[in-house]
């Protein structure tokens, strides 16, 4: 096996580990988006997300809004990074001409 193949297999294994870590973190983060409703000059915040075919709205206390917003932003970043890692894995598979054996 050549040095280049060894390096590509190591990178593939690293990418697999990174994807698993990102997927675990994604499972702990909230899905959806924050919506604001103004009723009688008061603002109410809701976390909107899908639960099967239904759209659910859960009330958020004003203190929770920024924390949840940061978690949702982190989720978007992780989804983009996960897609990039999956693209990288496909490129490595094409370069090697096979799927590397990862333990």
Regions found by a protein language model. Name each.
Residues 1-103:
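Conserved glycine(s) in the ABC-transporter nucleotide-binding domain "signature"
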């Amino acid at each position: 096996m050549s040095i280049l193949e060894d390096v590509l297999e190591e990178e593939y294994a690293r990418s697999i580990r990174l994807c698993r870590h990102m997927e675990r973190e994604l499972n702990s983060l909230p899905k959806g988006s924050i919506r604001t409703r103004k009723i009688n000059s008061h603002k109410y915040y809701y976390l909107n997300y899908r639960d099967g075919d239904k759209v659910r709205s859960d009330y958020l206390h004003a203190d929770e809004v920024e924390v949840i917003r940061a978690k949702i932003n982190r989720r978007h970043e992780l989804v983009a990074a996960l897609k990039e890692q999956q693209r990288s894995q496909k490129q490595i598979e094409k370069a090697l001409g096979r799927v590397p054996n990862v333990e």
